[in-house]
Structures are given as C-alpha cells and as structure tokens.
C-alpha cells in the first residue's frame, strides 16, 4: 500500500514510508516510530491512518545511527539492539528531522497544508517535543518515555496535544506521571487520558501488554482529536 520517499536535510537524506488516502488533497499525519524502527507495526499504523483519509508518513528517524532499522519486540536480541539504538539516538536532531518531514509532506501535492503527528514510546516523547518545537498543527503522544524530563518546554506548548498514559507503565512510573500532570493539567490545549491497569505499549498489536479495548479507545480518541484540529 505504501511508498518510499526521500527527505532532504543539510546533513543528508533519509527515507520515509508514505501511505496515501483514497481522496486528496488531505491532511497529513507524521507517524513517529518506537525504538524498533520503521517496522511492520509502524507501517500498519501509517496504512491505517491512510485508510481513515489522512496522508500518512513514517520517517526513518534512526537513519543517523543506522538506516533502515526494521526489528520487532519478539526476541531478547532485538530488544538489546533497540535499546542500543535509542541510547545512540539524538533527540534534538530527531525533532529537527521531524520538522523536515513536516516540511516535505506539507509541500506534497496530496497534502492540504495541515499536518499532525502521532508518536509511540520514544516517539511519544518526540510527539511532545513536536508540539513544543515544530509547526505541526497537532500532536498525539502514546506512553511517551522521558517527557517528565522535558517539561521545561511546556511553557512553549502552543500546539494542541493529546497524551495517552498507561497507569502501570514500567518506563513511566507513577511519580513521573504525577509530575507530567502537575505541569500540563489545566492547559487549554492539552488533553491527557490515563488507562488504568495498562502497561507500556498497550496499543502495540502483538506486544506483551497489548489490550485491544483500550487500544481501540485510544485510537478513537486520537482520530477525533485529529478530526477536530486537522479537519
């Protein structure tokens, strides 16, 4: 269903997976990867957004470390590689690459000019930073790891942001969740949804903590949010 395009930066080019909707022009959504690269899960999410009428694009944000990463969460060796990639990844440069992705897809003939973003895990933190640092029109963060360390940027949060937090997330402990809520609750442009009993990556199909009902609930909330802010 998808295609590959190249995105140009001052440091070089990187690939992105693109899925196009049946009708265009349409609003675009940048899908921000987990620590497993642009794998089948990310491509399926991208395809699914296209099926909902969005021009969806998933950039290879690990390209500066290792281009073309496509691994799963199904083996210890893959987990070790994923964490090594995450540790080598530069978040600040990654946000700049997201802005380059936004610029590229916004200029695509199939885009109507509106661009949102949705990110998962590491991508959840990047989605938060997309809302504070880029000109994306809206962003959704699923179980973002490390956001509690980035809350100094909350003052610059001018874009609509939705967050999905797993109450039992082993990577985002309750203390971190409390800090996030203290900083962001009450902001008119922020919506936070907490999922009781859920662990990290509850919306990752095939994952250890996947929960179909809450994944569907979060997905429906995200789509409604995009419909509101992207049209």
Description of each model-found segment:
Residues 1-231:
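N-terminal cap/leader regions of alpha/beta-hydrolase-fold enzymes
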